[in-house]
Amino acid sequence: MKKVKVCSPGTSANLGPGYDIFGLALSNPYDIVEVEKTENGITISVEGEKAEEIPTNVDENTAGVVAKKMIEDFKIESGIHIHIIKGIKPGSGLGSSSASCAGIAFALNELFELKLSKLELVKYSSLGEAVAAGAPHADNVAPAIFGGFTLTTSYEPLEVLHIPVDLEVLVALPNIQVSTKTAREILPKEIPIKDMVNNVGKAAGMVYALYNNDLDLFGRYMSKDCVVEPCRANLIDGYTEVKEKVKDMVYGITISGSGPAIITIPKKEHVIDIENIFKEVWNCPVYYTKVGPGCYVEEIE
């Protein structure tokens, strides 16, 4: 095996009250990560969405950081060339950096037959997130590896729970810049007990709803975060207006990750109406897609 081509999905983290815990894999958008054996060293090339803004230096690129660590840990003597085709816009709130991290970990596992578990792949993938977010995070890389719906419940040790789900989602991607750093800095350092109770209760209810295939309950609770979303809503011009306009057309709506992407669980009969509202307010790309699988191999040479 000389080359492997992997599809790595976009993801939506938080989903309302599940801040830094919940994650969802999306069938669209996605990145393609190609890894080819070379004589020595690690080289990186990028094309696609905002490719010119993505560093190709190994120590500054999220995929490069993951690759370097895995090559060191497993004493891989071969060099590699990483080619990333970005289908997920960086800074979108749809796990762009996570797709690169998960895609390279998955690809190296296949190319060099490392036989790592999905949990081990999440652990390596999360190291690359430190480049983008300042610290390792798994709420996006976990669904990118596992697919479906994931809960990252612990980091020491790393624990990820996985629930296969069948959901359709409608995602808007406003052309608004939201810095992940700013979106984290504006969050409160402490919260009242009543807010903690609200979010824990709603998050638990969402898991219950998934097991009972209750879209109404899942979406209603997804929309009821009282800690993070109120702080971030003002970073996305028009969000409060849109949330009010579509409230009867969706089961649930919230900010995807740190934004600016907005994720909804739409009522099928209103999909076109919601799309029109998104385009009227933001004139932006819209994805009508399903919850999808984690990384998978597209091609091997």
From Swiss-Prot:
Pfam families: GHMP_kinases_C, GHMP_kinases_N
InterPro entries, alphabetized: GHMP_kinase_C_dom, GHMP_kinase_C_sf, GHMP_kinase_N_dom, GHMP_knse_ATP-bd_CS, Homoserine_kinase, Ribosomal_Su5_D2-typ_SF, Ribsml_uS5_D2-typ_fold_subgr
Keyword Cytoplasm: yes
Record bears the keyword ATP-binding: yes
Signal peptide (residue range): none
Pathway assignment: Amino-acid biosynthesis; L-threonine biosynthesis; L-threonine from L-aspartate: step 4/5
EC number: 2.7.1.39
Subcellular localization(s) per the UniProt record: Cytoplasm
Reactions catalysed: L-homoserine + ATP = O-phospho-L-homoserine + ADP + H(+)
GO molecular function terms attached to this record: ATP binding; homoserine kinase activity
GO biological process, one term: threonine biosynthetic process
Record-level GO cellular component terms: cytoplasm
Positions contributing to ATP binding: K89, P90, G91, S92, G93, L94, G95, S96, S97, S98, A99
Keyword entries, A-Z: Amino-acid biosynthesis, ATP-binding, Cytoplasm, Kinase, Nucleotide-binding, Threonine biosynthesis, Transferase
Matching NCBIfam families: PRK01212.1-4 (NF002288), thrB (TIGR00191)
Function as written in the Swiss-Prot or TrEMBL entry: Catalyzes the ATP-dependent phosphorylation of L-homoserine to L-homoserine phosphate.
Family from the record: Belongs to the GHMP kinase family. Homoserine kinase subfamily.
Protein name: Homoserine kinase
Organism of origin: Methanococcus maripaludis (strain DSM 14266 / JCM 13030 / NBRC 101832 / S2 / LL)
Lineage summary: Archaea, Methanobacteriati, Methanobacteriota, Methanomada group, Methanococci
